[in-house]
């Protein structure tokens, strides 16, 4: 039988994941900064896992194993997010301030809002993407959470001009085309990478501020 402590933690995590940011900020204005960070980390972790699972399923279904490595080293695998000075790992992220990491995370999230509106049309028969029509909503929730954290840290007006030089294309619904398959494969790879960065930045900030034992990741 599961102990009361872990069970309570799991229930709290599930509740936070399902709770809209409007409720967090509006109905519970006294919610602690640690609670806002915990909520953001859970949402980013959930989205990153979904992105990773989807990439793996797409790769297994459509991309021959012998071609995967070569494709990942071509232009199709280039991510537009690489045009911004974003840390590439935990050590680099620790050199940035919390507000810098939040601004970068916001840019990464916002770069996907357009393409992900069409995601469910591409993966209508996918088991992993059975909830693909909600990915956009989840991403919007995370965007709101990051903005809430920025407001808490008194950065009311995010810097103008910090935008991606390019943005991501929409996913191609013509899955019978080789070009479309390669395009979608590249987009899913970038989505996975960008969500991994976002999750890493949020976890670095949370651990740095609150020094939790679970900071070794």
UniProtKB/Swiss-Prot annotation:
Annotated disulfide bonds: 79-190, 207-215
Subcellular localization(s) per the UniProt record: Secreted
Signal sequence range: 1-27
UniProt GO molecular function: growth factor activity; growth hormone receptor binding; hormone activity; metal ion binding
GO cellular component: extracellular space
Biological process (GO), any one: positive regulation of superoxide anion generation
Its job: Plays an important role in growth control. Its major role in stimulating body growth is to stimulate the liver and other tissues to secrete IGF1. It stimulates both the differentiation and proliferation of myoblasts. It also stimulates amino acid uptake and protein synthesis in muscle and other tissues.
Family, per entry: Belongs to the somatotropin/prolactin family.
Protein known as: Somatotropin
Organism per entry: Ovis aries (Sheep)
């Amino acid at each position: 039988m599961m102990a009361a402590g872990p069970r309570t933690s799991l229930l709290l995590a599930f509740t936070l994941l399902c709770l809209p940011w409007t409720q967090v900020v509006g109905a519970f204005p006294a919610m602690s900064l640690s609670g806002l960070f915990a909520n953001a980390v859970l949402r980013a972790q959930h989205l990153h896992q979904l992105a990773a699972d989807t990439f793996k399923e797409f790769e297994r279904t459509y991309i021959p194993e012998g071609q995967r490595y070569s494709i990942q080293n071509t232009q199709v695998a280039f991510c537009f997010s690489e045009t911004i000075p974003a840390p590439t790992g935990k050590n680099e992220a620790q050199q940035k301030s919390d507000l810098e990491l939040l601004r970068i995370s916001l840019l990464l999230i916002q770069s996907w809002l357009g393409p992900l509106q069409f995601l469910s049309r591409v993966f209508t028969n996918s088991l992993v993407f059975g909830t693909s029509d909600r990915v956009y909503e989840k991403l919007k929730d995370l965007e709101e959470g990051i903005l809430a954290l920025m407001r808490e840290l008194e950065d009311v007006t995010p810097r103008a001009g910090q935008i991606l030089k390019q943005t991501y294309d929409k996913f191609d619904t013509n899955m019978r085309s080789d070009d479309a398959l390669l395009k979608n494969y590249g987009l899913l790879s970038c989505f996975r990478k960008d969500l991994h960065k976002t999750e890493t930045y949020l976890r670095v900030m949370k651990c740095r501020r609150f020094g939790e034992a679970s900071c070794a990741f």
